Amino acid sequence: ELVHSFKLVKDQYSLLAPFYNRLTKLVFGDQLKWSKTCFAENLSGKKVLIIGGGDGLDYQIFQDDLEGEYWEISRSMLLKSKINLEGSDLSFHLGFFQAEKENVFDEVWLHFVLDTMRDEEIESLLIEVRKSLKPKGKVYLADFFVPQNLYQRFKQSIMIHFFRMVANHKRKNLPDYEEILKRQNWLKNAERDILKGWVKAQVWSLSTSI
């Protein structure tokens, strides 16, 4: 059953959803999938919060161990994820994630979602994530960072223009994720570079210092 939040937006991914995964694989192969799954381990018994997970196909291989919540603002993507992850123990939610008291998670996955948001939206989301994370919980970030060569800069420019046109993305550039996270007292615990560092997979936790 899908759970609806009170704050919904027009589904900007309705045109992309049917072929989004195939398009991603055509352009990047399995590199983006690997960035989302390279830190996924010992999931059994953990409660996971997935925000902006798309069609969920990249998580299918370990869906039997997934328990928690799956949030999407695209109804078409969420419907596909519910089918692709029908073997999981996730509940599926349509709308913008908002923390609920005493509903906390071991892990929060932010995979290729922050690059679609304005800085102030990222900051607001991270506040909600902070409320929803257990004291020793981790945030798993995977996203595009600074392009490492001319070809990557060209490809990124094409991608940004494409998603601004087709999916109404707001940004004309990439956020400085690390600056925003550090400003909110998050610590980077681990990092893996993909595509020479254009894509990074990172693990973050809350600093215990003030």
Across the structure, where does each feature detected by a protein language model lie?
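Class I SAM-dependent methyltransferase SAM/SAH-binding core
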Residues: 49-99
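Short catalytic micro-motifs in class I SAM-dependent methyltransferases
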Residues: 112-115
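A conserved beta-strand element that flanks and buttresses the S-adenosyl-L-methionine
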Residues: 109
